[in-house]
Amino acid sequence: MKQLHKQMSSKRDEETIPMSQSSPYSPKTLKHPRSLPRSLHYLFREQRLLFILVGILIGSTFFILQPSLSRLGAAESTSLITRSVSYAVTDSPPSRSTFNSGGGGGRTGRVPVGIGRKRLRIVVTGGAGFVGSHLVDKLIGRGDEVIVIDNFFTGRKENLVHLFSNPRFELIRHDVVEPILLEVDQIYHLACPASPVHYKYNPVKTIKTNVMGTLNMLGLAKRVGARFLLTSTSEVYGDPLEHPQKETYWGNVNPIGERSCYDEGKRTAETLAMDYHRGAGVEVRIARIFNTYGPRMCLDDGRVVSNFVAQTIRKHPMTVYGDGKQTRSFQYVSDLVEGLVALMENDHVGPFNLGNPGEFTMLELAEVVKEVIDPSATIEFKPNTADDPHKRKPDISKAKEQLNWEPKISLREGLPRMVSDFRNRILNEDEGKGL
């Protein structure tokens, strides 16, 4: 037995790797290299969960970045994946400029010109409305990702239903008087009832949307570094004493009248926008929009063009308030959309008039509607409404010079396009009522 014990001890000693004679520590027996596979096997078996989590992280990073990588070169793609994985491991998120650098656009949300234009993520408040839905069509058509925020107070899902299957379109039912957190490059803030019928129906809601809604959207723009465009209105000029109206004109507005919830609300929104620009460095654009018409207008929203067209199609008299000598200028909606996009992409801060300088009295407009729809249509006169501006015509010299923009579609060219849309909708409405 002693002989066997000596043999086994001798065998273990042969496998022992002696340490240096000068070491102050007692020698330890090291495992033979042949035992390493057993250690790796133990590691893989006992730490499977860790390896699974790392694999999921790497795979998720690849699939998230896949749309961006498809537009980048091979070297740039590899660099982007490496940066993203390193951020995930160190738990330190990249700044916005990390992914915007070299891709165009940057933190300001400006759209670069050229084939390799960076796809932007854009939010449009009030995007289910008349103007908003046409703007969304434009942005989707050029390849951007668009998020529409609307509470459907005046907006209609029918204006956007053709985009529901588009992967670059998203619709959120939300009221802008409440904050919302999104990551976007540009903000088009259109949310607010623009028709007298709607904003007089709920004046408190109207001014809250103008003030609180604008505050929330400006706060979002500040947090994420987005460029912000406010759609203001020619109503900020009130009943003007200057004709035509330039952007430098301060206006003549009744601050306590029936229309003031909208007029003064928009003036306050402009003030907030410029204060955020001066105080917080937010890039703001202000579009003072004059009378606009076109498809998707509400059939009975009280605005003069939609009123005249709907009344004539239904064989009702056209309602003219006052003597009919008030003047307005009318721009087609596609011209306005082009102006909004040009303003957003331009580097000029501050207000711009966007409108058609062609001026018509209400009686002249009624005659054009009769020419297009029904020469036998009649006119009915009613007392004028309170605070109705007598004249309204934009001076668009600034937009021409700095934005290279001016309207292209005349009233006689654009009105038939609107009439076609109104005929179809009124016909469908009558069929739904069984008329």
Swiss-Prot record:
It comes from the Eukaryota. Gene3D superfamilies: NAD(P)-binding Rossmann-like Domain. It catalyses: UDP-alpha-D-glucuronate + H(+) = UDP-alpha-D-xylose + CO2. NAD(+) binds at residues 129-131, 150-151, 153-155, 175-176, 190, 209, 262, 266, 292, 303. Its cofactor is NAD(+). It is found in: Golgi apparatus, Golgi stack membrane. It holds the Pfam family GDP_Man_Dehyd. Pathway: Nucleotide-sugar biosynthesis; UDP-alpha-D-xylose biosynthesis; UDP-alpha-D-xylose from UDP-alpha-D-glucuronate: step 1/1. It is a single-pass type II membrane protein. Residues 91-100 have a biased composition (Polar residues). Disulfide bonds: none annotated. One of its GO terms (molecular function) is NAD+ binding. UDP-alpha-D-glucuronate binds at I180, K208, N216, G219, K222, R223, Y276. Ubiquitous. Belongs to the NAD(P)-dependent epimerase/dehydratase family. UDP-glucuronic acid decarboxylase subfamily. This is UDP-glucuronic acid decarboxylase 1. The lineage of its organism: Eukaryota, Viridiplantae, Streptophyta, Embryophyta, Tracheophyta.
